[in-house]
């Protein structure tokens, strides 16, 4: 598809579809099925460029302005990258499955997780990311260019959080869990800046 050229007849047909609002008559679920199929291909960016070039984004992807994603990634990571490049507003009109939403939420939190954040904000970021539960997903997301300036910091922070023994939370009373967890997170943060 990378070198694929659309013929004149197909261009005219796509223009007609765009003007007729035919896509608006399709179900949200059908739209997502086609989007997911394109995300699973190695030419997802080309698909979204085509939608943009022929104005086939109404009403489902009206917030699409940047169609580029790293085509070597999983469908979930491609979608998260597209969301990030489109101000996290791309999936507002379509039924995005939870596994895709997970990656979008994680990427948004990873972008917000910066080295110069105040400690309380960094703690909130760590709690949102839940490194123990989402380690595999974050490893894939950290390879995105959008995180390149912060990748080393996040990787070091993740390593330090994962190195802490959160199993000790089982041994403390319910009243103490929050304080012990906070202590472990602060220790991981301190080790990250050391």
Go through each PLM region and give its residues:
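Short, polar/flexible loop-turn hinges at active-site or ligand-entry regions and domain interfaces
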Residues: 2-8
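Conserved, hydrophobic alpha-helical core segments of structured domains
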Residues: 12, 16-149
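Charged substrate- and nucleic-acid-binding regions of tRNA-handling and nucleotidyl-transfer enzymes
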Residues: 1, 130-194
């Amino acid at each position: 598809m990378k070198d694929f050229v659309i013929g004149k007849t197909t261009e005219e047909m796509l223009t007609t579809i765009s003007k007729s609002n035919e896509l608006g008559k399709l179900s949200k679920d059908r739209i997502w099925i086609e989007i997911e199929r394109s995300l699973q291909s190695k030419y997802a960016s080309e698909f979204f460029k085509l939608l943009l070039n022929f104005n086939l984004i109404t009403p489902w992807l009206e917030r699409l302005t940047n169609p580029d994603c790293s085509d070597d990634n999983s469908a979930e990571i491609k979608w998260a990258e597209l969301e990030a490049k489109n101000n996290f507003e791309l999936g507002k009109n379509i039924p995005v499955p939870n596994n895709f939403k997970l990656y979008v939420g994680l990427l948004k939190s990873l972008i917000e997780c910066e080295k110069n954040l105040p400690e309380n904000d960094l703690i909130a970021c760590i709690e949102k990311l839940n490194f123990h539960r989402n380690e595999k997903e974050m490893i894939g997301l950290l390879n995105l260019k959008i995180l390149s300036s912060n990748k080393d910091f996040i990787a070091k922070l993740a390593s330090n959080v994962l190195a802490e023994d959160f199993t000790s939370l089982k041994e403390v009373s319910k009243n103490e869990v929050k304080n012990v967890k906070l202590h472990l997170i602060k220790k991981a943060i301190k080790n990250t800046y050391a």
